[in-house]
């Protein structure tokens, strides 16, 4: 079976990017690592290793907790994630879907 080697882009990803890669892209938007117009469509999967390191380093000073973000970043995070959750729900996503993996 041929597996795709390039990412489809956050908007074409499962439920509009409710995946680990989608969350990483949104976090990169929050921290200004990527512009919000960057969907990462066509990125080769290994390129995400570099992005992961950058996003992880950006979260470190805040203990990887939204509540520890300064007000401007917290507001940006809320706006980006609220939009993503709204879109995902329109596409049929439910937070309970993530729990199905444990069953």
State each model region's role.
Residues 17, 31, 76, 81, ...:
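A generic signature of intrinsically disordered, low-complexity regions enriched in glycine/proline
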Residues 6-50:
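N-terminal acidic leader/helix
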């Amino acid at each position: 079976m041929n597996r795709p080697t390039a990412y489809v882009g956050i908007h074409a990803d499962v439920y509009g990017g409710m995946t680990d890669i989608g969350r990483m892209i949104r976090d990169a938007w929050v921290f200004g690592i990527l512009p919000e117009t960057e969907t990462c469509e066509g990125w080769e999967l290994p390129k995400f290793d570099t992005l992961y390191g950058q996003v992880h380093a950006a979260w470190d000073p805040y203990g990887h907790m939204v509540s520890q973000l300064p007000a401007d970043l917290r507001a940006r995070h809320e706006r980006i994630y609220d939009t993503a959750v709204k879109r995902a729900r329109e596409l049929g996503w439910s937070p309970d879907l993530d729990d199905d993996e444990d069953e």
